[in-house]
Amino acid sequence: MAWIQLRLNSTNEKAEKISEYLEEIGAVSVTFMDSQDTPIFEPLPGETRLWGNTDVIALFDAKTNMQQIVRLLQQKNHLDENTAYKIEQIEDKDWEREWMDNFHPMKFGKRLWICPSWREIPDENAINVMLDPGLAFGTGTHPTTALCLEWLDSLDLTGKTVIDFGCGSGILAIAALKLGAKSAVGIDIDPQAILASYNNAEQNGVAERLQLFLSEEKPTDLQADVVIANILAGPLKELYPIISNLVKPQGDLGLSGILSTQADSVCEAYQGKFTLDPITEREEWCRITGKLNSFV
């Protein structure tokens, strides 16, 4: 499958806002490079580790009207006559090769390993999740994914039900099933995420215990013992009524995709219904966990 790449030059002061806007108007991924083409891997909105002169690189579906994208950028003053930009078609294989070369087995917590299928398993006796997430979905290399995996490893999931809200590659739901959960549900807005999650679940022998739904198609009465959502602070606050209602009485909630500077506002949204644990931080990111109050 081909993608369309838009590459435009920016300053580090503007690059973050441009990145966020590109995602709003349909970019499936955004990366940053300096003038020497040194990448920052797996950025999320809010990253600040940029260079003085930064190239913003966005991938769009091949059917995207790029002239419309350019017009939208111009209307927001993200693109003017002095801004250099380039549009070209990119094949998946160019990106997948770079990703595969840099993806190694990783350990999370005491029991859990995430292993690319093309590499040797470091510990045959551990709980191993074999992962082929494909382009633009999580692999565990970002601090937020790592925080979520470590939290799941710390729980006794034996016989429990789990919901992975914003499942992406399915990495969290699959890890929960391998860690002993009875069943899991993955929810996402992207059909490609649903497909990637199913393929990864099948590869790990847990597909029969994993249900997958697009957000608008999930059952209205859906609930689980453990709910985990690794998305972003804005959606976590906006979707509080939906996410909180997915948790069974006395159930556990895990939230990430949150910058440390955003933790207080997310806690404020959830603390009325949940008894929250101390916040766990890594680099610029954090994880918020808690248990649904019995009086709710």
UniProtKB/Swiss-Prot annotation:
Reactions the enzyme catalyzes: L-lysyl-[protein] + 3 S-adenosyl-L-methionine = N(6),N(6),N(6)-trimethyl-L-lysyl-[protein] + 3 S-adenosyl-L-homocysteine + 3 H(+)
The keyword Metal-binding is assigned to this record: no
Binding locations of S-adenosyl-L-methionine: 145, 166, 188, 230
Pfam family, one: PrmA
Enzyme class name: transferase
InterPro entries: Ribosomal_L11_MeTrfase_PrmA (IPR050078), Ribosomal_PrmA_MeTrfase (IPR004498), SAM-dependent_MTases_sf (IPR029063)
Enzyme Commission number, as recorded: 2.1.1.-
Chief site of localization: cytoplasm
Record family assignment: Belongs to the methyltransferase superfamily. PrmA family.
Protein name per UniProt: Ribosomal protein L11 methyltransferase
Annotated organism of origin: Histophilus somni (strain 2336) (Haemophilus somnus)
Gene behind the chain: prmA
